[in-house]
Amino acid sequence: MKILSVLLIALIICSINICSEAGLIDVRCYASRECWEPCRRVTGSAQAKCQNNQCRCY
């Protein structure tokens, strides 16, 4: 049981770190595919989505 709680805490810490790496860029969008190329130019990765009409890069 002790190991399970340690693993759970480690998972939460890693999740917080991964989620905090996502960043908004100043590009308006209506669909996620509109964010792929701008995010590739900014971060080097095409992992992106359109959120509240603004691109979020991962």
Swiss-Prot record:
<keyword id="KW-0872">Ion channel impairing toxin</keyword>
<dbReference type="GO" id="GO:0090729">
    <property type="term" value="F:toxin activity"/>
</dbReference>
<comment type="similarity">
    <text>Belongs to the short scorpion toxin superfamily. Potassium channel inhibitor family. Alpha-KTx 16 subfamily.</text>
</comment>
<dbReference type="InterPro" id="IPR036574">
    <property type="entry name" value="Scorpion_toxin-like_sf"/>
</dbReference>
<keyword id="KW-0964">Secreted</keyword>
<feature type="site" description="Aromatic residue of the functional dyad">
    <location>
        <position position="58"/>
    </location>
</feature>
<feature type="disulfide bond">
    <location>
        <begin position="35"/>
        <end position="55"/>
    </location>
</feature>
<keyword id="KW-0528">Neurotoxin</keyword>
<dbReference type="GO" id="GO:0008200">
    <property type="term" value="F:ion channel inhibitor activity"/>
</dbReference>
<keyword id="KW-0632">Potassium channel impairing toxin</keyword>
<dbReference type="GO" id="GO:0015459">
    <property type="term" value="F:potassium channel regulator activity"/>
</dbReference>
<feature type="signal peptide">
    <location>
        <begin position="1"/>
        <end position="22"/>
    </location>
</feature>
<keyword id="KW-0732">Signal</keyword>
<dbReference type="Pfam" id="PF00451">
    <property type="entry name" value="Toxin_2"/>
</dbReference>
<keyword id="KW-0800">Toxin</keyword>
<feature type="site" description="Basic residue of the functional dyad">
    <location>
        <position position="49"/>
    </location>
</feature>
<dbReference type="InterPro" id="IPR001947">
    <property type="entry name" value="Scorpion_toxinS_K_inh"/>
</dbReference>
<keyword id="KW-1015">Disulfide bond</keyword>
<feature type="disulfide bond">
    <location>
        <begin position="39"/>
        <end position="57"/>
    </location>
</feature>
<protein>
    <recommendedName>
        <fullName>Potassium channel toxin alpha-KTx 16.6</fullName>
    </recommendedName>
</protein>
<dbReference type="GO" id="GO:0005576">
    <property type="term" value="C:extracellular region"/>
</dbReference>
<feature type="disulfide bond">
    <location>
        <begin position="29"/>
        <end position="50"/>
    </location>
</feature>
<comment type="function">
    <text>Inhibits potassium channel.</text>
</comment>
